[in-house]
Amino acid sequence: MKRDMGSYKMGLCCSDKLRMNRGAPPQDVVTAFVEYTEGRSHMTAEQLCRFLVEVQDETEVLVSDAEKIIERITCERHHITKFLRHTLNLDDFFSFLFSDDLNHPIDSKVHQDMASPLSHYFIYTSHNSYLTGNQINSECSDVPLIKALKRGVRALELDMWPNSTKDDILVLHGWAWTPPVELVKCLRSIKEHAFYASAYPVILTLEDHLTPDLQAKAAEMMKEIFMDMVYFPEAGGLKEFPSPEDLKYKIVISTKPPKGSLRKDKDSESDASGKASSDVSADDEKTEEETSEAKNEEDGFDQESSNLDFLTYSRLITIPSGNAKNGLKEALTIDNGGVRRLSLREQKFKKATEMYGTEVIKFTQKNLLRIYPKATRVNSSNYRPYNGWMYGAQMVAFNMQGYGRALWMMHGMFRGNGGCGYVKKPDFMMNNNLSGEVFNPKAKLPIKKTLKVKVYMGKGWDSGFQRTCFNTWSSPNFYTRVGITGVRGDKVMKKTKKEQKTWEPFWNEEFEFQLTVPELALLRIEVHDYNMPEKDDFSGQTCLPVSELRQGIRSVPLYDRKGERLVSVTLLMRFHFL
């Protein structure tokens, strides 16, 4: 039997004797305060600046920055509207360290090189971006598109189909029972929210089931709605993708070139080079009905009309899609004449990495590779994203309306680089080593770096959970799981002891992680309430890119199962690299 937090608080006077004391600073915090104040009761801006440089490794911080921190903390804690006191006491210092606004665990600004071609970046990518729930009969809507863009997703997918009278365009999941949404509504919402979270380009992946006249209509819609936001590539196709910096505030179209387009001679010399293919045809699981219908539509096209229509539509396509119809090896062949996108369902991608792992990585050094969930994931679950990232796949497409550890990893990866939706791939994935070999994620590699993680304490569950699944009669017994996900040799999970009967658990435990590929590693953090004999209650999670961790004592905010911020729920942790 479960009950909400309010009913739990009413039972605080019971014999359970719940410990509700406000957490005192850990000894490491006290020691640092004493050391940098030289034993005095207050810390000056100069002393705080020294602490930030020497302990927090913030080498570019100035005394003026420390003064702003002191002013902010003083105003918040003591309600001083005028900056009269220029120092922090121990409690103020502790409050600063526990502030995820002022002392966040990773850099909140874009800091990576954004001037390389798109193929050099992992791109925050959504699958069936318009679905509100499962893949069978959930409603199609522009709301999931808006949510994804606000979260920082940079690549969206729209499935375009003719309406029943063949004179307008709907967005829906084909061969299912999903109530459709009008394309025009989706495009307007994309325009309005495209750059809410990031200035870098939105890639619109179109799965095209339209006749030439409707393709032309779609092109006119996009030009009319997006106006100067839409990016027009150079005539004849690209030799190399533009950079995210080049494409700032632009919407980039990716789909199959229409049949008979000017790109045909160049891009369709073989199926591997971009012959008319949507994500559906990039998989040999196509149904006979689907293949037959596509052929009938093509055979029924009016050639005179389509010659005019494809000029309008194909002019918008920056990233032509390819397929694996003639086999994986041919699909992964590098075409020195241009660049393209290849889309593979997760099972076919797994097969590709098992048979042609080296070719996959070489392909992604120049081209884009998109992976999407298998058809049996009707509940909108997701696969492990590292399966794609380890082989350089830029567009690991996820069902953003789902939840679970795979989605937590996705959120974690793209908290990196200021949450802009583009994360630079490590140099070793883009360049061959001295022996001319590409990166092999299955190889046994030497330890490159050691990460020490100390979990001090947590707070906020008493106010952060409006309703909770904590056990009715037992007080919270929180513990934290800390681990690494990444290449096979780096994967590990550890956990703290259970902290008995308290809303503000204090663990003060340290863990050490030896990493062979820290550039691809994520730090996983989960908090649970021990609930024997039932299943332990989930109490918060986060994932953080190891390469982005800021050294020192940091405030780490936690999120719910769907990746939404748990208001006030925070851990105090310390990170140190050896």
UniProtKB/Swiss-Prot annotation:
Domain PI-PLC X-box: 112-256
Reactions mediated catalytically: a 1,2-diacyl-sn-glycero-3-phospho-(1D-myo-inositol-4,5-bisphosphate) + H2O = 1D-myo-inositol 1,4,5-trisphosphate + a 1,2-diacyl-sn-glycerol + H(+)
Domain C2: 430-560
Molecular function GO labels: phosphatidylinositol-4,5-bisphosphate phospholipase C activity
UniProt keyword Hydrolase present: yes
Main location: cytoplasm
Topology relative to the membrane: Peripheral membrane protein
Residue ranges occupied by any PI-PLC Y-box domain in the UniProt entry: 314-430
Highest taxon, organism lineage: Eukaryota
Location of the active site: H127, H173
Keywords attached to this entry: Cell membrane, Cytoplasm, Hydrolase, Lipid degradation, Lipid metabolism, Membrane, Transducer
Enzyme Commission no: 3.1.4.11
Tissues where this protein is expressed: Expressed in leaves, roots, flowers and siliques. High levels of expression in the guard cells and vasculature of leaves and roots.
Keyword Cell membrane on entry: yes
Induction: By environmental stresses such as dehydration, salinity and low temperature.
CDD domains, per the entry: C2_PLC_like
Family matches, as SUPFAM superfamilies: C2 domain (Calcium/lipid-binding domain, CaLB), EF-hand, PLC-like phosphodiesterases
GO process annotations (BP): intracellular signal transduction; lipid catabolic process
Entries under SMART domains matching the protein: C2 (SM00239), PLCXc (SM00148), PLCYc (SM00149)
Intracellular or extracellular location(s): Cytoplasm, Cytosol; Cell membrane
Domain EF-hand-like, first and last residues per copy: 28-111
PANTHER family: PHOSPHOINOSITIDE PHOSPHOLIPASE C 5, PHOSPHOINOSITIDE-SPECIFIC PHOSPHOLIPASE C FAMILY PROTEIN
Protein name: Phosphoinositide phospholipase C 5
Gene that specifies this protein: PLC5
